[in-house]
Amino acid sequence: MSKQGDDCYFYFYSTCNKGDNCPFRHCEAALGNETICTLWKEGRCFRNVCRFRHMEIDKKRSEIPCFWENQPGGCQKSNCAFHHTKGRYVDGLFLPPSKTTLPSPPESADDDLKAAQITLQQNKLSVQSNPSPQLRGVMKVENSENVPSPTHPPVVINAADDDEDDDDQLSEEGEETKTPVQQPAEENHNGLRIISTRKSNADTKQDDSLNFGIKTLEEIKLKKQKEKTKKQSEGPSGVPAHPLQSRTVPVPEKENVRTVVRTVTLSAKQGEEPVIRLNIAEKPGKRKGSVADVSGLPLKRSLAERLGRKIEVDKAPRREKGAKPAGEIHVKTLEEIRLERANQRGETLTAPQAEVCCKVEDPSSGVRPPPAVRIKTFSEALAERKQRRLEEEKQKLEEFLTEKRAEGERKKQRILPPSVPGKVKLEEPTRKIKPLEEVHIKTLEEIKQEKALRMQQSGENVPAPAAQPGPAPAGRKLLRITKLAAPGKEEKKTVELSRASPKAVSAPAEPSNQSAPNSKAQVKSLEGTVKEKLQLRQPEKLKKEVAAVPSATEETVKAKCKVCVKPSDSKASTPTKRALKRKAAEISPSAVAAVKPLSSTETEEPPAKKAALTAAPALPEDSLLTKPGVEKPPSSLELQLGSQADSVEQSGDSSSASASSQSVAKAQQLSSTGAGKAPLSVEDDFEKLIWEISGGKLEAEIDLDPGKDEDDLLLELSEMIDS
């Protein structure tokens, strides 16, 4: 807050909220004073307390009534500079009303302005209520002096009327081109035009002019433009009649000319109506007259050409049909049209696609009108194509399925060789247990390879000495060798891939007969095993190979020794225990899948295999290659194989019994060292029970070490088989 300088506007006329921080002057002595300090104007006022104002005052606030005086609280400022007509109390002090009087001349001027505005509004209302052309001209002349602004609506309308009148005069005097259709209409309206020019002030004729003149200027101008374009396009056809009629009207009277022009435009409108009616009525039928031909036919031809229809052939029958009354065309109901469409759809479904083009031209000779044909070609043709495609796809799918079924039956017939009857009998229940996808996995090439290998091996009577050379294995592979238990019955074991990489080594299977050792090996190709791995997941295959064991074996397994099946990709905690238990499980023949610890599913066997397990040779003690002292990482695997498979197969029941006792003793040692939980008597009972159920059949499992090359593995296999 400063005591010098310019005044604070809010301090003197309102309230300043800044207080001492305000840079402008706050002076109590100058409150309510409206006199400007002359020294401040010159810049020489250095008084601390100056009673005069230090700001430019351009308003006489003493003549302006105070706003707060009329409010409920009243004006509460003791030094209010505005005019007060009433006395007021401020802080207990009575302040009389202002001595100055408000000036009266401005009020009278305002009254004059208000009166002028009222008269103008009345004039506007009168002009709007009487929109006849004569009265418009008169009101325009009378009100042109009083209208303050040129944007007044009646002025705009009258100015447009003047321009219109000038255009009408020029068109009547200069241009002599009128259509012959309009001339009789003008002659018909001749009497109305003459009466309207002579008796324009009569009320009845004013009503007529009101009815005819209600149309806006834009509509009339549009009609005139259309008439001019028609005249220019058609040429001067009706020259001599119209100028005579226009000369009969006195030109200098503007009002008369205006009414004549309005009636002429109305007659032109009435003259145009029959042409439009003719066009609408004769659109579906014959074209009569040159005007209708000019307006209607080129559009129809262009549409027909767009649709690709033949114009010359189809036009004549269409016109003959159009000669019928219009009611016959519209007689058809929705149901009839739908029935026709349904019939045509049925025809198109049976007929090939080449008939679609013919359908566009055929309805010209039939009963149906052409618009329905157009609808048919666009929307329904697409629907028909979609239906055809769907039907073709369905037929292709059905043919494909029938071909696949026929191929499956052929494969089954090819798989049935006369030399191996028992194998096929046991293949069917295993396939019933497995899902249907396994039937479609094997290709023809794989089946042919298997058949060729079987024929070759049965001719040579030699078990598969070496597997097909493949890439080096990156993970664990399980190759199962199954032996015949009883004559005429045999188990089929598929090669199980228990690693993630899609490479496989074929599994030699050694079926044999006790009476005559017909040893055959079933070798699956690399592609077959890879596809089986990709399409059948490992856990599902394990669960389906490990089907239900008889109830007696389940109870004994649960009660005495928990032998668990584990997917071969998972890792065990202790490698030594896993290896030992794998060897122990190798001797117990009831397990079909790889037997490993730390898993939930227990060993089971399908009942179809139980019938086949009657008597089988056992592996001797030295056939197991065991390394009990060496610890391996969980990924390392041991190679385990029954080396003397052929000699054991060819031996009799006596040798099998002696070998079985040795293997039971070996299994007893392995299970006691590996598990270390069950006592020896329990394990003896368990081994005896399994031996009784299996009938002496053994299954050897080969675990291939991924660290070795294929050549080394094949050499070891051949040595074991030869020994």
UniProtKB/Swiss-Prot annotation:
Residues 609-620, 650-672 have a biased composition (Low complexity). It holds the Pfam family zf-CCCH_3. GO terms for biological process: poly(A)+ mRNA export from nucleus. This is Zinc finger CCCH domain-containing protein 11A. The gene is ZC3H11A. It comes from Gallus gallus (Chicken). Its main location: nucleus. PANTHER family: ZINC FINGER CCCH DOMAIN-CONTAINING PROTEIN 11A, ZN-FINGER, C-X8-C-X5-C-X3-H TYPE-CONTAINING. Residues 511-522, 637-649 have a biased composition (Polar residues). GO terms for cellular component: nuclear speck. Residues 142-208, 223-256, 404-428, 450-526, 565-681 are annotated as: Disordered.
